[in-house]
């Protein structure tokens, strides 16, 4: 039987209009039709936008699962031997490992092993819970005891999707479990949320890392942390009965809010979770932070999620801080160059105890010198130098200087690198910054003429030690004309005249008013007529001693005609005339 053809939507186009254009009713109906069509278009656009977001969201989830599956399909096969259920009694775990009923299934299951199931030998079998009808879930099908099949519309993505259909199976129905007393049952609800939702908890423990192709499937599924443990964070509290249902609903609500932050940049959701962390219920805080942990790296790089992670640092236990520290270390480079992730790293340097930041700084050093010159990561380095962690700085600066040897010139002439260099000058010990200072002063001729490097030289002149100042001032006098007429170097010369008035001012005036190589021309004339140097001469004529002003005025009078006719010399000519009176 053929299907009836679907009637096309006419969007009101079938509305018959009078043929007389001058009819008032014609105009009214035309306006009505236009408004009707506009309303339809507006509603359709809203639906399309909403559908597009949902479709994109689902596509992202599918792509992530496909990527994980392609990397190692074996890690998606369910577990068969020695499940090692941490929440079960030891005797129960042993019996389950020997007497697990497996149903036939395809190998394409998307249920990821629970983090509480480790050291597994995988076969091409899937294990699912028992349904209310005493059925086993396999590939989306209930197989009843009478042989009939009841199909699921979709394969459950995790045990969460099927937990409403799960009931306790009486273990006294068979003779396979002699140690259990009669009429005893296992209720998954009593085992806690971690057992009910292995898919989500596996990501909480394993993060985004999947076993590489070729790795043994017997590999422990936990991260191994620097302290030698395999627990990434504290387990959520185990509840039972109705409390667990309420607890599961709370976890689901938190996850939904995290999803809103990640996919929709929802500021309100971020603020709401931050507010919940401020309550006095320590248990709720631990559970909330444990729920956030699996998504921590993604949230760190999110516009509003990064504030949530920073707030988590303030309320985390030591174990949770260590978990965050592990993720920070693993992704330190990508976080440091991210606009929002860099803020999280800066916060960690402020709030973390020193034992947590050792490895973090070591990883940052391996990314040198690129991270010193990047727009966002440079602020992480500035925060590190400003924290003045004595135990860290003493041991790390040797490694830091060795890594940066021969690269300070490149860093000093960059916009962000020059800021980091000045921060080092302000906050580090003399022995730690000596390598940097020597390399910069030795390459001063290239740095001083740079748009950003000139600020580094000015900083040394203003705040450096006396020997370093003298080395720079001597270099300025050797190339006095060149530096005084350069766009950026002239700023350094002016800064030296203002800061080192006693030691440098007289030497500079003498240098620019003394004829060179027995020629009548002097540097003062060239500097006064230069578009950048004329500001230096103006400053000299205003603050010099009377004898120095008279000396410079006598030299400049000889060139008054050219000064008055020059765009940049008119102001100097006026000052010379003023000095006469």
UniProtKB/Swiss-Prot annotation:
GO molecular function: mRNA 3'-UTR binding
Keywords: Meiosis, Repeat, RNA-binding
Keyword Coiled coil among UniProt keywords: no
Pumilio repeat residue numbers: 291-326, 327-362, 363-398, 403-438, 439-474, 475-510, 518-554, 555-581
Alphabetized PROSITE patterns for the sequence: PUM, PUM_HD
PUM-HD domain span: 225-580
Gene Ontology CC entries for this record: cytoplasm
Disulfide cysteine pairs (residue numbers): none
A single BP term in Gene Ontology: nuclear-transcribed mRNA catabolic process, deadenylation-dependent decay
Pfam hit, one: PUF
Function text: RNA-binding protein essential for meiotic progression.
Protein name: Meiotic PUF family protein 1
Organism: Schizosaccharomyces pombe (strain 972 / ATCC 24843)
């Amino acid at each position: 039987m053929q299907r009836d053809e679907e009637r096309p939507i006419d969007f009101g186009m079938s509305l018959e209009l009078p043929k007389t254009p001058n009819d008032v009713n014609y105009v009214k109906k035309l306006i009505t039709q236009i408004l009707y069509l506009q309303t339809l278009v507006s509603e359709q656009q809203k639906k399309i936008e909403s559908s597009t977001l949902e479709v994109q969201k689902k596509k992202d989830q599918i792509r992530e699962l496909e990527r994980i599956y392609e990397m190692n399909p074996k890690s998606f096969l369910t577990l068969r031997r020695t499940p090692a259920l941490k929440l079960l009694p030891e005797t129960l775990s042993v019996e389950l490992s020997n007497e697990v009923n497996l149903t036939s299934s395809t190998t394409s299951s998307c249920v990821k092993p629970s983090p509480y199931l480790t050291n597994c030998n995988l076969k091409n079998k899937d294990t699912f819970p028992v349904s209310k009808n005493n059925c086993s879930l396999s590939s989306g099908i209930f197989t009843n005891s009478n042989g009939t099949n009841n199909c699921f519309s979709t394969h459950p993505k995790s045990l969460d999707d099927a937990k409403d259909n799960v009931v306790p199976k009486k273990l006294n129905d068979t003779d396979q479990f002699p140690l259990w007393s009669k009429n005893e049952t296992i209720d998954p609800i009593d085992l806690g949320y971690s057992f009910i939702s292995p898919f989500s908890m596996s990501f909480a423990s394993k993060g985004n890392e999947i076993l590489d192709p070729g790795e043994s499937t017997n590999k422990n599924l936990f991260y191994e942390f620097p302290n030698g443990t395999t627990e990434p964070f504290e387990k959520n509290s185990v509840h039972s009965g109705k409390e667990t249902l309420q607890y599961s609903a709370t976890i689901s609500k938190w996850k939904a809010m995290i999803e809103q932050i990640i996919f929709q940049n929802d500021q309100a959701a971020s603020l709401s979770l931050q507010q919940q962390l401020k309550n006095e219920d320590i248990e709720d805080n631990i559970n909330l932070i444990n729920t956030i942990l699996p998504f921590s790296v993604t949230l760190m790089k999110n516009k509003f999620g990064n504030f949530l992670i920073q707030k988590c640092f303030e309320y985390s236990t030591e174990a949770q801080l260590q978990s965050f520290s592990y993720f920070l270390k693993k992704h330190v480079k990508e976080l440091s160059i991210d606009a929002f992730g860099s803020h999280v790293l800066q916060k960690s340097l402020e709030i973390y105890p020193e034992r947590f930041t050792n490895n973090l700084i070591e990883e940052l050093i391996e990314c040198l010198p690129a991270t010193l010159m990047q727009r966002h990561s440079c602020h992480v380095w500035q925060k590190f130098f400003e924290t003045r962690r004595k135990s860290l700085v003493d041991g790390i600066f040797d490694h830091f200087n060795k890594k940066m040897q021969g690269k300070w010139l490149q860093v000093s002439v960059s916009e962000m690198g020059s800021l980091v260099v000045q921060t080092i000058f302000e906050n580090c010990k003399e022995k730690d910054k000596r390598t940097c200072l020597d390399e910069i002063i030795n390459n001063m001729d290239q740095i001083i003429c740079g748009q950003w490097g000139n600020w580094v030289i000015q900083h040394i002149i203003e705040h450096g030690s006396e020997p370093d100042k003298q080395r720079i001032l001597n270099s300025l006098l050797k190339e006095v004309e060149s530096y005084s007429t350069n766009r950026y170097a002239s700023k350094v010369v002016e800064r030296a005249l203002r800061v080192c008035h006693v030691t440098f001012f007289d030497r500079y005036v003498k240098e620019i008013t003394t004829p060179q190589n027995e020629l009548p021309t002097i540097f003062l004339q060239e500097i006064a007529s230069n578009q950048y140097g004329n500001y230096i001469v103006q400053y000299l004529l205003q603050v010099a001693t009377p004898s120095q002003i008279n000396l410079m005025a006598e030299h400049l009078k000889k060139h008054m005609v050219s000064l008055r006719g020059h765009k940049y010399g008119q102001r100097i000519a006026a000052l010379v005339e003023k000095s006469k009176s």
